[in-house]
């Protein structure tokens, strides 16, 4: 089983990492190519391209200038400890043991506009480059063209080492990021967990809660060493319950009704 997550825009380089182990990202040469292109942009260009504030554009202009193809604990941090958004609050890697993180290293992957595909312990230098950014490059009009089938091929290398029910991809990424994966070329079926909360008289996806729940699901897989997708149906963290009637073989729906 491989579970894929989206990255986070919010980053934490202040909190010291609680583990020393780290690995190097697989697509450093590709990331370097993107950085070379990003370095040609002014802060004003970055603000317009990414629809971000001027201070944030200046911050990322400097990040691109500082970025190095040499990764060390002095200039980078393990990805799963550096990302700090809703998904990663749910995953809460800071409280996972080194043994848990070793398991995550084999079963969790993070999709990234700059780095392509990251393992949890891959070193990450600070950046901002969302997968949906229409950043024209030598390979095409946007990052989907840039990455092509590279991410899918990398996932297949991992999936092909699994067998039976364990050869499955669990999609806990956003639509924007999962578009970088080509399901028809994958060497495994895809299961997408969907998290809905009761609000206004019906069940609906509430972005903040759904993002957190994706992280909780990834943690559930890691802590319980899950390899069989049927075991995902037992997920019940923070009140979510698997709804068999709303689910099918490729979409697992979890619902929560609180306070009504």
From Swiss-Prot:
Gene Ontology BP terms: response to hydroperoxide
Region forming the signal peptide: none
InterPro entries, alphabetized: YaaA
GO cellular component terms given for this protein: cytosol
Pfam families in the cross-refs: H2O2_YaaD (PF03883)
PANTHER family: PEROXIDE STRESS RESISTANCE PROTEIN YAAA, PEROXIDE STRESS RESPONSE PROTEIN YAAA
Family as reported in the entry's similarity comment: Belongs to the UPF0246 family.
NCBIfam families: PRK02101.1-1, PRK02101.1-3
Record-given protein name: UPF0246 protein Bcenmc03_2247
